[in-house]
């Protein structure tokens, strides 16, 4: 009986994965990464983005299945955690555990904060014009960290702006590396990752990032130890650079 049950479960899983494969084949592939593919299309009549964590041939199948499922669940929970706290993030439509697919709301007609900053700097050529955006970023990320949610990959490409852009309505995306932690060290590292990405992607914007940190400090109930840890992480980073 046990063998028959296992065979039936395996057949059901294979059938579910085949249905998912056929559905994805009808969508538009918009991004191919090392860990996942991102598709755009319609899901139950709604504009959707589907993130598919595809299996890696170099990993043991059982380990791969557990890792893919865990990361898919973590990302879905992170999005829900944000939304419950009033932080804008895509709506989760459906989680396909058989194929490790996450079906989410597409933020239509949005632009990345990265593209917005680059366009604004090309037009205005003055980082002062970014201060309001930087302050808004500080408020949003302070709220996220106050929920003990660590993004894990903070860049300006992982933040979207809804239109009208002047309202600075930021939507956080791509929580694939997220996790829950109340440790100031983890939050400090999160900010350090953003700082490195921000200043390397957007040269001559140091004043804007300073405005971001001031806003973060004023908006977060737990900012003091986090910003102290950020300074420590910076120092460690400089020491590693000097050592080579």
From Swiss-Prot:
InterPro entries in the record? Bud32 (IPR022495), Kinase-like_dom_sf (IPR011009), Prot_kinase_dom (IPR000719), Tyr_kinase_AS (IPR008266)
Task: Tell me the active site.
Answer: 153
Classify the source by domain of life. Answer: Eukaryota
Residue ranges of domain Protein kinase in the record: 24-244
Q: Which Gene3D superfamilies does its entry note?
A: Phosphorylase Kinase, domain 1, Transferase(Phosphotransferase) domain 1
Q: Where does ATP bind?
A: 30-38, 51
List the molecular function annotations (GO) for this entry: ATP binding; hydrolase activity; protein serine kinase activity; protein serine/threonine kinase activity
**PROSITE patterns registered for this protein in UniProt:** PROTEIN_KINASE_DOM, PROTEIN_KINASE_TYR
Catalytic activity from the UniProt record: L-seryl-[protein] + ATP = O-phospho-L-seryl-[protein] + ADP + H(+); L-threonyl-[protein] + ATP = O-phospho-L-threonyl-[protein] + ADP + H(+)
Q: Which Pfam families match?
A: Kdo
Coarse class of the protein's main subcellular location: nucleus
* Positions of modified residues (Phosphoserine): 25
Q: Does the keyword Kinase apply?
A: yes
Which SUPFAM superfamilies does the UniProt entry name for this protein?
A: Protein kinase-like (PK-like)
Q: Which residues cross the membrane?
A: none
Q: Where in the cell is it found?
A: Nucleus
Q: Which UniProt keywords apply?
A: ATP-binding, Hydrolase, Kinase, Nucleotide-binding, Nucleus, Phosphoprotein, Serine/threonine-protein kinase, Transferase, tRNA processing
Keyword presence, Disulfide bond: no
Which Gene Ontology cellular-component terms appear in the entry? cytoplasm; EKC/KEOPS complex; nucleus
Q: Where is this motif: Nuclear localization signal?
A: 69-86
Function description: Component of the EKC/KEOPS complex that is required for the formation of a threonylcarbamoyl group on adenosine at position 37 (t(6)A37) in tRNAs that read codons beginning with adenine. The complex is probably involved in the transfer of the threonylcarbamoyl moiety of threonylcarbamoyl-AMP (TC-AMP) to the N6 group of A37. TP53RK has ATPase activity in the context of the EKC/KEOPS complex and likely plays a supporting role to the catalytic subunit OSGEP. Atypical protein kinase that phosphorylates 'Ser-15' of p53/TP53 protein and may therefore participate in its activation.
Quaternary structure, from the entry: Component of the EKC/KEOPS complex composed of at least GON7, TP53RK, TPRKB, OSGEP and LAGE3; the whole complex dimerizes.
Q: What is known of its domains?
A: This protein is considered an atypical serine/threonine kinase, because it lacks the conventional structural elements necessary for the substrate recognition as well as a lysine residue that in all other serine/threonine kinases participates in the catalytic event. TP53RK has protein kinase activity in vitro, but in the context of the EKC/KEOPS complex, the catalytic subunit OSGEP switches the activity of TP53RK from kinase into ATPase.
Question: In which family does this protein belong, per the annotation?
Answer: Belongs to the protein kinase superfamily. BUD32 family.
Identification of the protein by name = EKC/KEOPS complex subunit Tp53rkb
The scientific name of the source species is Mus musculus
Recite the lineage of the species: Eukaryota, Metazoa, Chordata, Craniata, Vertebrata
């Amino acid at each position: 009986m046990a063998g028959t049950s296992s065979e039936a479960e395996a057949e059901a899983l294979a059938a579910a994965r085949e249905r998912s494969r056929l559905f994805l084949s009808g969508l538009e592939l918009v991004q191919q990464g090392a860990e996942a593919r991102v598709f755009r299309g319609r899901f139950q009549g709604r504009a959707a983005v589907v993130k598919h964590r595809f299996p890696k041939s170099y990993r043991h199948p059982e380990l791969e299945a557990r890792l893919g499922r865990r990361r898919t669940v973590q990302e879905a929970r992170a999005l829900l955690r944000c939304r419950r706290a009033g932080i804008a993030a895509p709506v989760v439509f459906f989680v396909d555990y058989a194929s490790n697919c996450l079906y989410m709301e597409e933020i239509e007609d949005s632009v990345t904060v990265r593209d917005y900053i680059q366009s604004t700097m090309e037009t205005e050529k003055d980082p002062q014009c970014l201060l309001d955006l930087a302050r808004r970023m500080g408020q949003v990320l302070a709220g996220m960290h106050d929920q003990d949610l660590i993004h894990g990959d903070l860049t300006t490409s992982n933040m979207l702006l809804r239109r009208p852009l002047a309202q600075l309505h930021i939507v956080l995306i791509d929580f694939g590396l997220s996790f829950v932690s109340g440790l100031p060290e983890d939050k400090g590292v999160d900010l350090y990752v953003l700082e490195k990405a921000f200043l390397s992607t957007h040269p001559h914007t140091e004043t804007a990032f300073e405005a971001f940190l001031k806003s973060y400090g004023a908006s977060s109930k737990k900012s003091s130890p986090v910003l102290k840890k950020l300074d420590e992480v910076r120092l460690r980073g400089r020491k590693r650079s000097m050592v080579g």
